Regions:
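Conserved helicase C-terminal RecA-like lobe
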Residues: 4-19, 32, 39-193
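Conserved RecA-like helicase motor-core motifs
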Residues: 18-28
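A short beta-strand-to-loop transition that corresponds to the Sensor-1 phosphate-sensing loop
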Residues: 1-4, 25
C-alpha cells in the first residue's frame, strides 16, 4: 500500500477470516506508535487503573516527565497499593516542582476527558484528546523537523483511526475489538502471507 493508513481495513479483514499476514517494510496499523499512543489515552480515560496505558502516555507528547519521576510515581503506587494515576496525584501533592505542574495538567486533562466520555461519543472524546493534548501538533512538528517521509503519514494514520471508530457504538466496544486484534496478532503462526 502506498498510503500506510489504508492498510487498516485490509488487515482487519485478514484477521476476521483467520488468515495470518505480515506487513513487509512497515508496521501493522495497530502496532504504529501514534495509534498505540491514542489507544493508550483512550484506555486510561476508560480505566484510571490501567498502569500500562498511564506509563505510555504520561510523557506523550513530551512534558518533561522523565524516567526518574515515573519511577517515583511507580514506587508510590506499589507502596500504597494504588494505581499509577492515583500515585501521580499523590506525587504532585507532595512535591513542589516544575514537573508537578505538568503532572497536574495531565491529571486534569484525563479527568476532563472522563467527563467528555460521559456526555459525548467516543469519536468526540478522541478528537478532544488529540486537541487538548496537542498530539497532532506534536506529530506536525516531528514531520516538519524530520526528513523521514513516514512522519508525514502519521497524521493520515490518526485520521484513519478516527474513521475506524465509526464502526463501533462506544469506546468499550472499540477497545475490546482492538484487544482481540492485538491478541490475534500476538498469537499469529509463523506462516503468513
Amino acid at each position: 500500500f502506498r498510503v500506510s493508513a489504508h492498510t487498516r481495513s485490509f488487515e482487519e479483514r485478514l484477521i476476521a477470516i483467520g488468515l495470518p499476514y505480515k506487513i513487509i517494510g512497515g508496521l501493522r496499523f495497530y502496532e504504529r506508535k501514534e495509534i498505540k499512543d491514542i489507544i493508550a489515552y483512550l484506555r486510561l480515560v476508560n480505566n484510571l487503573g490501567d498502569d500500562l496505558a498511564f506509563e505510555r502516555v504520561i510523557n506523550v507528547p513530551k512534558r518533561g516527565i522523565g524516567k526518574t519521576t515515573i519511577g517515583k510515581i511507580n514506587q508510590i503506587a506499589r507502596l500504597n497499593n494504588i494505581s499509577m494515576f492515583d500515585a501521580s496525584r499523590k506525587f504532585a501533592e507532595e512535591n513542589q516542582t516544575k514537573i508537578n505542574i505538568e503532572i497536574n495538567n495531565f491529571i486534569l486533562n484525563i479527568l476532563k476527558w472522563q467527563k467528555v466520555k460521559k456526555n459525548f461519543d467516543h469519536i468526540e472524546l478522541t478528537k478532544a484528546i488529540l486537541e487538548d493534548s496537542k498530539y497532532v501538533d506534536h506529530l506536525e512538528n516531528e514531520a516538519k523537523n524530520s526528513k523521514n517521509p513516514e512522519n508525514l503519514s502519521r497524521i493520515d494514520n490518526i485520521n484513519e483511526f478516527i474513521e475506524s471508530l465509526k464502526d463501533f457504538e462506544n469506546l468499550e466496544g472499540f477497545l475490546e475489538h482492538v484487544g482481540l486484534i492485538m491478541e490475534n496478532i500476538n498469537n499469529t503462526d509463523t506462516q503468513t502471507i
